[in-house]
Structures are given as C-alpha cells and as structure tokens.
Amino acid sequence: MTRPFNRVHLIVMDSVGIGEAPDAADFKDEGSHTLRHTLEGFDQTLPNLEKLGLGNIDKLPVVNAVEQPEAYYTKLSEASVGKDTMTGHWEIMGLNIMQPFKVYPNGFPEELIQQIEEMTGRKVVANKPASGTQIIDEWGEHQMKTGDLIVYTSADPVLQIAAHEDIIPLEELYDICEKVRELTKDPKYLIGRIIARPYVGEPGNFTRTSNRHDYALKPFGKTVLDHLKDGGYDVIAIGKINDIYDGEGVTEAVRTKSNMDGMDQLMKIVKKDFTGISFLNLVDFDALYGHRRDKPGYAQAIKDFDDRLPELFSNLKEDDLVIITADHGNDPTAPGTDHTREYIPVIMYSPKFKGGHALESDTTFSSIGATIADNFNVTLPEFGKSYLKELK
C-alpha cells in the first residue's frame, strides 16, 4: 500500500491550549484560554501560524482568521482524566488514562520520605511544591554542607530530586532516582515521573544543568509509537518525548536544551533520510512561562516559534506532513501555577496541499495518533478518528 506521507513531523507546543475544555469546570478551569490570554496586548504578529489557519480555530488576538488557510486545522478535547504532560502525550498516541496520576500540593507522605531516607542513607529536605530555581536558592547551600536530598514537586504528578553535582555525583543521583522510581510504582503513590535535577555553582549563583533525567512509568499499553517501531518505521524522539514514553516505541532519542535548540535538532533530522516520524516536544512554553505565569515571556516564545516555521517548511519534502499541536493548557493568567484543562489546537500542513479547511473537532487527542497510524498502515488506536482521507 502506498503511503500518502513518507514522514510525519509531530511538534507538541507544550501547554499551548486553545480554550476551556467541555469539562473544564470539573478541574476548576472555567474561562481558561492559554493562547488568547497570552496574546492579549502582544504587539507582534504571528504571520506563519496565521497563514496555516491558527486564527480559524478560535478567535485570537494578533492572529486573524484567513480565507484560504494553507493547512488543515481543528481543536481536540481530552478524554483522559488528567491534565498533565504524560497523560496528554499518552492520549495523543492512543491511550486513555482513566485513573489520574496524583499531585502533592502539600508535599509527599511522611511514609514515602522515610523510605527514601532509609534506602539512600541521606536525609530529605524541602518536601513541598516549588519552582526548581526557587528551591535551590532556598536549600542549595544547605545541600552542599550536608549532602541531604532536596525533594520537591510541582503542579504535575512528579517527584524531583535536586543535588549539587560536586556533592552528589551524577551517577549516584541517577541511581537514587531509579530506586525512588521503583518505590513509587506502588499504586498508592501514582507518581508519573521521578526527575533528577542536578545543579552547579556557589550560594547565590546556582544554576541547573542540562543533566536532568526523567524516570517515567512505562505506558500501560501499546501506543502508536510501538506499532510504528514494530512495523519497521523510524520513531525519532526529540526533547523530553523519550522520557515521557520511557523509551517505549522509540528508535532514536535526541536531547534538547531549549525550544530553539529543539527546532535546531528538528532541522537536522528533517534533512536526514528516514521513513517514519519525528516527534518533538517544546517544553519551554510550559516550564519557563506557563507555570511561572510569565505572560510576556510566553507570548515571545510563541513568536520565536512562529519565526522558525519558514525555515522548517523550506526543508520539507513533498511527501512530508507536519502536525503542530499541544498536550494541555497552562494559562499564564489563571490563578495558581497549575495546568489548565483546555482544547488543544491541531494544524496539519504538507507542501503538497493546495490549501486546507476545518476538520471535525468532536473527537479526542487520540485522533492525532490515529491519523499517523492510518498513514503508515499500522494498528489504529482504540480511540480517536483518523483524518487521513481528508488530507489532500
């Protein structure tokens, strides 16, 4: 069977939601709209996303609706019960998560902390939700003096362990995180990821290094990535994609340091010869701007991404398909620091399209995975609807 597209390049703009989901009230997220609220008052345009049809999905500041969009577009709602990165990505590739991962707004249970201390022989300090930079400013000097483990969490279902690289060598920190991953597989904890967060520097001038490592749970079933890999296709994971799926279904993993580095890595991969998918997560939208409620920074990051699209498109082959989407919302104007339950935008573009139009929106994140699976003639996910026949 001939494939309409030899390669699919899937880009997740982490947290760039496009309006409250139908069940937003269940998550106390009524009125959330990451894109609209981020772009309100922004004094620059997004000409490339506009041409593709982003402004046709929903009314947005600085992004107009266009009469002849160059891409197909829609918005999708989440069927799974969480609004975290892992849940969103797993659903994109065909899994629905009906038991949510747990978040720990008051820190982790004393029982778990004691287990970590006994297992590692090191005391645990902090044990609260915090930003990574804030927590090392607060506890970094103490950690250097004592060798204690700085354990903290966020609005996500994660347990993070920070340590100075000169005090706890990377290999030891990674080993500790692997052991904590095993501990927290106990269903009573339901923690999505354990994250090693090494840092360097002196008191008052600490910086986190790029030696971060995530220890995820393995997806509880086969995803579209597994079916692609089993079918002999390339699955190139860029950024934190490899960690999100714990390496399952991935044939090559490329690390990134930032959104722009992620785009640089994607450009290199687009110029390579392969058949299958590249799958890029651009985490800065979420980690640097959404959680920190930095609206101007968030808007500028979207502009920086928009600026890179002509370079990407000029390097595409005729039978390439680019899908731009998100995994949840993180409205920088919402109260608190948590993700927001939102629709995700979906834009599908190929050089061979003569133009595009709206696609059905009454379906779920898994429609992205279904479209990719359908293209490569591998097992379709149980959920979602393939748009492949409409992409002409």
Swiss-Prot record:
Entry coiled-coil feature ranges: none
Cofactor note as given: Binds 2 manganese ions.
Keywords: Cytoplasm, Isomerase, Manganese, Metal-binding
Superkingdom as given in the UniProt entry: Bacteria
GO cellular component, one term: cytosol
Gene Ontology biological process terms in this record: 2-deoxyribose 1-phosphate catabolic process; 5-phosphoribose 1-diphosphate biosynthetic process; metabolic compound salvage; nucleotide metabolic process
Gene Ontology molecular function: any one: phosphopentomutase activity
InterPro entries from the UniProt entry: Alkaline_phosphatase_core_sf, DeoB, Metalloenzyme, Phosphopentomutase_DeoB_cap_sf
Binding site for Mn(2+) 1: 14, 327-328
Enzyme Commission identifier(s): 5.4.2.7
Pathways involved: Carbohydrate degradation; 2-deoxy-D-ribose 1-phosphate degradation; D-glyceraldehyde 3-phosphate and acetaldehyde from 2-deoxy-alpha-D-ribose 1-phosphate: step 1/2
Binding site for Mn(2+) 2: 286, 291, 339
Xref: Gene3D superfamilies: Alkaline Phosphatase, subunit A, Phosphopentomutase
Secretion signal span: none
Cell location: Cytoplasm
Cystine pairs: none
A Pfam short name: Metalloenzyme
Catalytic reactions of this protein: 2-deoxy-alpha-D-ribose 1-phosphate = 2-deoxy-D-ribose 5-phosphate; alpha-D-ribose 1-phosphate = D-ribose 5-phosphate
Annotated family: Belongs to the phosphopentomutase family.
Functional description taken from the UniProt entry: Isomerase that catalyzes the conversion of deoxy-ribose 1-phosphate (dRib-1-P) and ribose 1-phosphate (Rib-1-P) to deoxy-ribose 5-phosphate (dRib-5-P) and ribose 5-phosphate (Rib-5-P), respectively.
Protein name (database record): Phosphopentomutase
Annotated gene: deoB
